[in-house]
């Protein structure tokens, strides 16, 4: 009876009584975030399959800070933001930096900036080189389209700067993508166009074409008719919440449980999960087919480590018996350092943002060849620094070196964009810029079994000085935008605070170290890569050494992309659902 009472306390489903709760499901999905709800929707299309999603957050469909298309940032620090902090960042003023992640049905798609931009072709193609045959742009494009319901811009939105090429978009998917109705004033567009083109940054007619270099107005995940944010819950769960075979259960997964017998080739077989309710009481739910971990890049490693999967040295310190030695768990964390310039502008409200994606040659100019050579020469040093920072047995420096070499080729051979500059006009506003491909590598690990909601996150911001140099160059290039005609007659730049107008590189470096922020775009902590490179999951997204545990979230993305993670995640999750369904037949 006690067991049943705990289980019933965990259950929460819309329109159904908790009395109908069951303790056994074909699939258990850990996390009702951006990726988890995509997988849940697609798996439950088969009425003979039962799917449970375990999520500590709640339904936020009526939260104005979520539904509003102009309330970005209002949810930060509230009950639906995990509001993590990094460890002290030794190369960034020894400060702890905030990291935002959604704690709600829909995960971070409920609190992010809604930007829908995928990335460059070469970046997705690089995944194949890391031990993932079949993972490339061509394979993912159909899934991007499958998820998308693109809204063609109105004539006034086109006049205000919205552009698109229909062949790159889907029009029948569950995820609404478009431009906010408030984007109706076109007087801002010519200023941006003329200024960027004066700096040799061309207009990009569609930032979702697989080539993001240039500038353009990025679409967002919203319904243009109702002017409402279209997060993963609204797109993938609300329309199907009455399915009798799909349930969201409130609780926090502490660990995966294992069957006594082994699977093929001696693999571990998951038979369920241990779940904690809000009072810390636990129960075990049974999984008959698979466990899919979709807790996000900062939480998925914690679930794996608590389950005995990870670096034996770390597991021993936690008092956890090693089930599978996978030192890559929690490593390869890649987070983007970010900064901003504030300004006042004599401009009408535009209520949208222009994204400029710039290459190394754009921001380094005549020094690009020297930067390329210096960066290539520094790769072994960057790799050793990452290995030493993680401690013995966590990271193989040679493996990190290979990853950084692939990244170097993307930037300097394939002309991948190295920085994003975001120009937002809200009467006044800000210009935000960040390094897209940091060479720094960090980690996230479980603090203790008693603190499963408090990850130790160490992105090691600026561990590789390339990241600092690139952010400096991006900041200086952003200032050039505001001080170039015709924009300079319309705006007055007021930042960075404490930095003189003609600041030296050294002054920029000092300022950035003291004022940098984390972009809350973490990836890579359960990377889809060859095991000898530090990979955690294979090309089928299955955790190495397990028979039936997969990971589907940002932690599997092995290398940053030039877009915004949400777009990439919808495509990855759609494909993952097909992989899982295919394995069952």
Curated annotation (Swiss-Prot):
Pfam families cross-referenced by the UniProt entry: GMC_oxred_C, GMC_oxred_N
Oxidoreductase is among the record's keywords: yes
Top-level EC class: oxidoreductase
Keyword tags: FAD, Flavoprotein, Lipid-binding, Oxidoreductase
Subunit structure of this chain's protein: Monomer.
Chain positions recorded as FAD binding sites: 104
Native organism: Humicola fuscoatra
Entry-linked InterPro entries: FAD/NAD-bd_sf (IPR036188), Glucose_Oxidase_domain_2 (IPR027424), GMC_OxRdtase (IPR012132), GMC_OxRdtase_N (IPR000172), GMC_OxRtase_C (IPR007867)
Active-site residues, as the UniProt record annotates them: 521, 564
Protein name per UniProt: Glucose oxidase-like protein fsoC
Cofactor(s) the protein needs: FAD
Lineage top rank: taxon: Eukaryota
